[in-house]
Regions:
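Heptad-repeat coiled-coil alpha-helices
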Residues: 47, 51-54, 58-61, 85, ...
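Short, charged/polar, low-complexity loop and linker segments
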Residues: 21-25, 54-65, 98-104
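Positively charged n-region of N-terminal signal peptides that target proteins for export
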Residues: 1-4
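Short, low-complexity, disordered segments immediately C-terminal to signal peptides
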Residues: 18-34
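Long, amphipathic, charge-rich alpha-helical segments that form helical bundles/coiled-coils
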Residues: 68-113
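Post-signal-peptide N-terminal segment of Sec-exported extracytoplasmic proteins
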Residues: 35-77, 126
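C-terminal motif of bacterial Sec signal peptides marking the signal peptidase cleavage site
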Residues: 13-16
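C-terminal amphipathic alpha-helix
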Residues: 34-42, 98, 102-136
């Protein structure tokens, strides 16, 4: 009877451990999916930034429009810097940390990269709108 209990305990422990590792892996995979999405948007960001930088070098016809272009350029720059900062600070190596610490860290990182994604989407959408209206 004792042997059965010991085997059952070991089995449950192994199942619990593998479940926590799966939770950690799933959360990390989720973070990396958002990161990959943000990186795909980087081309659009750089394209818009280049166009705005070129327009800003032209002689000013309308000061308000120049201010608007500069604000859009700064939003693009800020979202690019936010992504770079997140990438430099992100540490996927969580060896020797408890499951709770790993889940908290990954949860915080998921919120951070989602914030970067949102910031970048706003900057790209607003600059796309401005640039497409300017071409008309």
């Amino acid at each position: 009877m004792k042997k059965i209990l010991i085997v059952a305990f070991i089995g449950l422990t192994l199942i619990a451990c593998s479940d926590t590792k799966k939770q950690e892996k799933d959360l990390l995979d989720n973070i990396l999916k958002v990161h990959d999405k943000v990186m795909m948007n980087d081309d659009a960001l750089m394209k818009n930034k280049t166009q705005l930088d070129s327009l800003l070098k032209l002689p000013a016809k309308d000061t308000a429009e120049k201010v608007n272009m500069k604000a859009l350029d700064m939003k693009l720059l800020a979202s690019e810097e936010a992504m770079e900062n997140w990438m430099h600070k992100f540490e996927p190596d969580v060896a020797n940390k408890s499951h709770d610490d790993i889940m908290k860290y990954y949860g915080d990182q998921k919120k951070a990269i989602m914030s970067v994604d949102s910031q970048m989407n706003v900057a790209i959408t607003e600059s796309n709108k401005y640039l497409s209206n300017r071409k008309k």
